[in-house]
């Protein structure tokens, strides 16, 4: 079970990112606080997921549903995570009675570990008791040894997990090349939910004059972590006062926190590639198309994302909600369409709908887009009519957009063309080249009207509509 909740998430590595690096006794309190915060993060993610399945709303954020799992990663793969959460939702929704209790069992063990850590900190830090007197060695060899010393034992739930999930979590392959996307494997689901939730709650929307974007708010997130840490250590008021030997190491450094975030982004990007591999029926090798950024975030060309997803969405009849925002000066109006993809031709069909006409208890793939150019002088009815008229061209629009969309890290070395030419079939490469040459703005409209996709995610329609009302940025729909 170490692999299940800790090795799998990378937290068995010490601050030096080396499994062999030991934990000195004067750093013990800091690592215990780190485990406490991790337990809270895990429990919050799992509780939100259960609440969404059972009640359709997240506990941690009353105005969001599955948006609490809308992670920020630099691989331009938001549409992949949208389908991944759809996969997880569908699996657990169909097995709710027999599967969901696992999250309660895991939460119980995490709470036990948290209480043990808090009690130990009280003894070490406030009562100034030597760690050696409590049976701890001067240097703890690894996080695995620390967890054993903390009596982290999940034998009482291992059998229940084995009964409900075909793959024993203890046998999880830690080799990145062996990483697979399989929602019947509990360790995969737990990692995905935790990484997605953490990277969602710590992101912020930037609303600049000419650009909307999203990033991790490191300053605010780090400050929150520090405030949480202060609740557990003595802050220099214990028996040794300001000279407390644990105080120096009780708080995580900002650089260490940034490394944790980068590690979670890297893991989620790898899971996204594993998802692509599990769904790919194209004549290509996904691993050979993988490129790693200087920050160790892996990516596959966006063009292939779409070719794989259009097959996935059409075969599963995945409900798609296209939300188009039209801006004019300081006013805006929103148009909503339900989209379907033909599994044989991959052509799109659109149905213009009002908010009340969507299935509000079904999570949709939501695509937000911004209409600009001549659209500002058009009525909402005319713009909706033009989009309906152009629906036969929507596939080509998406192929063109995905082939031209700037994607990190491919934009650094400009080698995407060469990579695709050598790794995909001639038909796919020719389709890519043709799409990349086209003028995206001329595919759907005859005038200067332009449609710019902003973001793709999974959400219940009712929650999305309420959330959309509050996102009235001057230059964006639902900012990415």
Curated annotation (Swiss-Prot):
Its EC number is 6.-.-.-. One of its GO terms (molecular function) is ligase activity. Pathway: Siderophore biosynthesis. Transmembrane segments: none annotated. It comes from the Eukaryota. Probable cyclodipeptide synthase; part of the PUL gene cluster that mediates the formation of pulcherrimin, a red iron-containing pigment composed of two cyclized and modified leucine molecules that acts as a siderophore, a chelator that binds iron outside the cell for subsequent uptake. Two leucine molecules are cyclized via a cyclodipeptide synthase, and the resulting diketopiperazine is oxidized by a cytochrome P450 monooxygenase to generate pulcherriminic acid (PA), which can then spontaneously bind iron to form pulcherrimin. Keywords: Ligase. Disruption phenotype: Impairs pulcherrimin production and subsequent red pigmentation. The lineage of its organism: Eukaryota, Fungi, Dikarya, Ascomycota, Saccharomycotina. This is Probable cyclodipeptide synthase PUL1. It is an enzyme of class 6 (ligase).
């Amino acid at each position: 079970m170490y692999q299940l909740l800790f090795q799998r998430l990378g937290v068995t590595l010490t601050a030096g990112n080396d499994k062999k690096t030991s934990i000195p006794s004067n750093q013990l309190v800091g690592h215990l606080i780190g485990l406490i915060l991790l337990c809270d993060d895990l429990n919050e993610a799992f509780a939100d997921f259960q609440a969404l399945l059972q009640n359709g709303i997240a506990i941690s954020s009353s105005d969001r549903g599955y948006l609490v799992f809308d992670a920020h990663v630099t691989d331009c793969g938001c549409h992949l995570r949208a389908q991944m959460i759809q996969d997880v939702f569908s699996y657990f929704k169909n097995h709710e009675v027999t599967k969901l209790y696992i999250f309660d069992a895991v939460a119980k063990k995490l709470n036990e570990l948290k209480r043990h850590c808090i009690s130990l900190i009280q003894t070490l830090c406030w009562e100034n008791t030597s760690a050696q007197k409590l049976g701890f060695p001067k240097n703890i060899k690894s996080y695995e040894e620390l967890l054993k010393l903390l009596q982290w034992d999940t034998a009482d739930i291992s059998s229940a997990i084995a009964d409900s999930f075909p793959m024993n979590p203890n046998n999880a392959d830690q080799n990145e090349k062996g990483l697979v996307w399989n929602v019947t494997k509990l360790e995969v689901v737990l990692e995905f939910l935790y990484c997605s939730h953490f990277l969602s709650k710590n992101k912020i929307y930037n609303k600049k004059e000419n650009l909307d974007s999203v990033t991790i708010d490191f300053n605010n997130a780090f400050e929150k972590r520090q405030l949480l840490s202060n609740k557990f250590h003595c802050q220099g008021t214990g028996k040794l006062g300001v000279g407390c030997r644990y105080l120096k190491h009780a708080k995580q450094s900002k650089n260490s926190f940034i490394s944790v975030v980068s590690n979670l982004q890297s893991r989620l990007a790898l899971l996204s590639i594993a998802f692509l591999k599990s769904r790919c029926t194209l004549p290509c090798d996904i691993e050979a198309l993988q490129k790693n950024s200087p920050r160790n975030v892996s990516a596959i060309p966006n063009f292939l994302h779409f070719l794989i997803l259009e097959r996935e969405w059409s075969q599963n009849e995945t409900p798609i909600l296209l939300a188009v925002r039209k801006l004019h000066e300081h006013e805006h109006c929103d148009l909503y369409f339900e989209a379907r993809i033909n599994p044989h031709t991959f052509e799109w069909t659109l149905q213009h709908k009002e908010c009340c006409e969507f299935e509000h208890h079904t999570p949709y793939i939501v695509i937000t887009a911004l209409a600009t150019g001549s659209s500002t002088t058009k009525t909402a009815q005319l713009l909706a009519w033009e989009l309906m008229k152009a629906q036969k061209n929507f596939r080509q629009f998406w192929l063109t957009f995905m082939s031209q969309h700037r994607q990190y890290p491919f934009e650094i070395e400009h080698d995407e063309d060469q990579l695709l030419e050598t790794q995909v079939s001639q038909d796919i490469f020719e389709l890519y080249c043709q799409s990349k040459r086209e003028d995206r703005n001329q595919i759907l409209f005859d005038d200067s009207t332009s449609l710019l996709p902003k973001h793709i995610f999974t959400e219940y329609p009712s929650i999305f509509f309420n959330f959309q009302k509050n996102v009235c940025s001057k230059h964006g729909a639902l900012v990415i």
